[in-house]
Amino acid sequence: MFTQLKRGRTAAMVFLAGMTVSASAEAQQDDRLSIHGSATIAYGKSDRLPVTGITKDGTSDYQILALQFGYKISDKDRVVTQLLHRKIGSSPLNAVTPAIDPVWAFYEHRFDNGLTVKAGRNPLPRGIFNEIRYIGTLLPLFRVGNAVYGETLEFVDGVVLRKPFDLGSDWSIDATLFGGGYDLKAQIPTSTGVSVVNTRNENTVGGQLWVNTPIDGVRVGAFANNYMSTPSATLPEAQRPNRTTTFLYSAEAVFSKAFARAEYTTFKQTKSPNFVDFSSYYVQAGVNPTEQLTLVAEYNDGRNMVRFANTPIPNLALPLNQDVALGVSYKPSAQVAFKLEGHRVEGYQFDTPVPSVIVPTAPPLVARLAPAQRTYYGLLSVAFSF
């Protein structure tokens, strides 16, 4: 099984490389064809527990490769396809991650009034980083805002409409609406261990609004999405989940020598047996002492409510991981970045089950948390793009 999986990953990388060479030759003959690629290759090692695919043994099987093809049909029309190969060390999420994932495949038309319409498999307009989080040269860390972005929600299959509005006095807004469906993959700690979620949400409608302030680089945003979990219609009515709404709030200030960002997300499903009550956030700040050097600190946190169905035991807030990260990035050019980062992780969201909830067996019937686990890990990576 391991050999077959390794061969599949190797074949995927060879396939992407072959497509790049072939497409590059064609691009030289047709200036309407554009090709962009990015890769981030890393080595990680933890001191105790496995986390985000990084083990005590260390792993170099840690990479993100993205290859994007665009074709300009006219001045107002284009098509874009992006292929993604991702390997996250020994993470349980590898089991639900394809070797090659066509994360984007859309047609785009721009109207004279500034309205843009995309149809197909579109980038999901969600938060600060969602549309660029696999381009390592644009990120201060290997991954950013892991508590909010995770390893999912890259796309929406459907339609996306975007339009900017000038409000005057240097204020403006960017408004986006979308509808369709998308995959949801996540790794969530529960009272009994680690749960890998791999579901499909359909009949979703949502939008995002960015407010750009007169201060250059400062903006605030909000994202909302109402969706139906599947299966639904094929289930007995009493078992069908309610529609769920998820929210994301963002704030960003980026200047020439410093930056600060924060995002918070939450969603809730109150109907049994699909009870979910989840929230998480991150804050990030950094400085750029020189054009090539970036120093960054980031804190991620969140919680998942544990419900003890059919018992008098009250719900319990199960913390996720409190992740404190410090990193340094050196960019000799805009296309290359070398990064070194260290993380202190404390909580219950690891790649192997850890004791989390102590269920009461006698009065008082109040559950309590087991002692939180802690581990440290480091990542050394190189990112390049073209």
Predicted regions and their residues:
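Bacterial N-terminal signal peptides that target proteins for export
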Residues: 2-12
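Small-residue packing motifs within transmembrane alpha-helices
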Residues: 13-14, 217
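Outer-membrane beta-barrel biogenesis signature
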Residues: 14-58, 230, 332-336, 383
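Outer membrane beta-barrel
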Residues: 29-35, 42, 56-184, 210-216, ...
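Short, small-residue-rich loop/turn micro-motifs
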Residues: 39-45, 83-85, 123, 226, ...
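Outer-membrane beta-barrel pore domains
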Residues: 50-55, 94, 105-110, 130-134, ...
